[in-house]
């Protein structure tokens, strides 16, 4: 419209990204009335019954986008109170590409909650190192460069995936971060490098799990306005590249 001179105000965005819907199973009683998930119970995940009448079997319908008319909705306030807002955000963004529908599941919600608990345990361990509660050899060596390289490369991955709306891939990147940092914490050296890299990691976590990231930054006494970390391009270069060779269909 702005380019066609229909409006004087320039539009703030180049385009609209339409995300998929959040879906849930549908349930009906024997009289064909819709039932809310809270009205349904199951002991084996296969057979469902009404909570107020365990003798009445529930008809499980197809998975459809959440709607009040079909009563297949989840109360956001209840879920947030139980698991926290960050867990909900993490689950919704991790399940599938944003243009695809997301199937709501209690198991997926619990998995996201547990992952944030693991990140919190990792944070406490790193904080203990920075506070001298865990002794390390505080000097620069090849481990410092490995830490710098991993952190810069993962930040670049997350930056690229954010620009492409690949939120589910970003969550996979978060698991890479956890696996690396939890494995390498016992080998960490040079506290300045640890703190600088970890703060940058918290910055790239913040779009997805902002409350967790902000709490961790607060505990590290980072009170200034945080900015998206700049990548040092020298760490993006690979000295070694693994090439798979196949001869007659077999890897050599």
Ranges and model annotations:
Residues 27-85, 99-110, 234-236:
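Conserved phosphate-binding loops in nucleotide/dinucleotide-binding enzymes
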Residues 3-13, 78-252:
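Helix-rich, typically C-terminal accessory recognition domains appended to large enzymatic cores
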Residues 14-19, 66:
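Extended hydrophobic secondary-structure segments that form protein cores and membrane-embedded regions
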Residues 18-28, 206:
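Short, conserved secondary-structure transition motifs
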């Amino acid at each position: 419209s702005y380019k066609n001179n229909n409006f004087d105000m320039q539009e703030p965005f180049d385009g609209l990204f339409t995300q998929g819907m959040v879906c849930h199973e549908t349930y009906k009683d024997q009289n064909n009335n819709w039932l809310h998930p809270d009205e349904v119970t199951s002991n084996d995940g296969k057979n469902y019954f009404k909570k107020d009448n365990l003798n009445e079997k529930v008809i499980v319908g197809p998975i459809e986008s959440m709607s009040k008319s079909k009563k297949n909705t989840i109360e956001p306030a209840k879920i947030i109170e139980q698991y926290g807002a960050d867990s909900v955000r993490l689950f919704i963004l991790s399940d599938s590409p944003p243009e695809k529908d997301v199937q709501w599941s209690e198991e997926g919600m619990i998995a996201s909650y547990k992952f944030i608990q693991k990140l919190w345990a990792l944070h406490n361990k790193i904080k203990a190192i920075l506070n001298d509660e865990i002794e390390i050899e505080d000097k620069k060596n090849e481990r410092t460069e490995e830490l710098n390289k991993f952190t810069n490369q993962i930040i670049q991955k997350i930056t690229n995936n954010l620009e492409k709306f690949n939120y589910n891939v970003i969550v996979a990147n978060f698991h890479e971060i956890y696996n690396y940092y939890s494995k390498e914490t016992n080998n960490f050296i040079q506290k300045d490098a640890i703190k600088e890299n970890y703060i940058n990691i918290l910055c790239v976590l913040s779009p997805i799990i902002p409350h967790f990231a902000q709490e961790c930054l607060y505990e590290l006494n980072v009170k200034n306005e945080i900015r998206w970390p700049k990548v040092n391009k020298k760490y993006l270069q690979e000295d070694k590249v693994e090439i798979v060779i196949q001869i007659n269909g077999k890897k050599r």
